[in-house]
Amino acid sequence: MYSEWLKGTWMLDSFTAADEEGETIDYMGAGATGFICYSNDGWMSVQIIKPDRMRYDISDVEGGTEEQTISAARGMFAYAGKYTVDEENAIVYHHLEFSLIPNWIGSTQKRYITKESDNVLILSADPVRMGPGGNKRKSRLRWKKADIT
């Protein structure tokens, strides 16, 4: 059921994180953009960027100052690897082989699937420390199926 439905490209609609008191933040900032892809051969990739990432002074690959390079890394969230789906419990497991966060390489990230509609996917995770104050927050990413036209 979910395995087939997930396949394809989904565009980020929102990325929020709520703490135990219910305070919600836009984790990557209002207007964050990105996509997640689930391929037919069992691979997935996600890329998310903040809307206000600092641009490099020049357009070379290594053209940024140290401050610009740090800002670019902090303004992006990305990983890829194989995925498996637990149909019964509506969970997708991301088995990471690549990640902007080095400590996540080799890990498995569990995401709870909610099918809001045929074209809207919600992925949420167990609470982790993220955002201001280092509070534990539960992330909720809302994705819309990419337009193929």
Regions found by a protein language model. Name each.
Residues 1-149:
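Lipid interaction determinants
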